[in-house]
Amino acid sequence: YAPEAAERVIQFFKLLVFAQNRWAGKPFVLQLWQEEMIRAFYGVQVLDDEGNWVRYRRFLYNEIPKKNGKTELAAGLGLYHLLADGEAIPDVGIFAVDRENAETLYKAAKYMVEHTAMSQPPHRPMVYCRDSVREIRTRFGGLMKVYSNDVENKHGPSFSAILCDELHAWKGR
């Protein structure tokens, strides 16, 4: 177990703000169950073939009732993978049963970027949003983008992280 790996994710959330409802704009405070889930996923590591410590788990599945912060948590985790997970040029895909649902997650991440505690110089931001194509880009080539759930047509991207919202509603999953 590598507590520092999990703690890095938890500390990242302290830079973010909530994006929806009455908490919009307030600091993102993880609930205990969210912290424990992050610790269980990001903290458990194994040695790979090259002798590097890597995450043991590759899939994080979160199923809880509506209005419990799933979308905001997913948006924050997506931003973590885009900005802080250590990949040089990360590619984070946002998928949902339809484009409208995927855009809900994108809008939460966008709000977090635009209202974050991470200070960015206005003339050259590290992260910027492009609404016309529903994507968040980093100055270094990282990308977080909305895709349809038609996975068969998604040849090319080598995703660093994939965020799937409303998975229970997908046909043929």
What is the meaning of each model-derived region?
Residues 1-173:
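Phosphate/NTP-binding elements of NTP-utilizing enzymes
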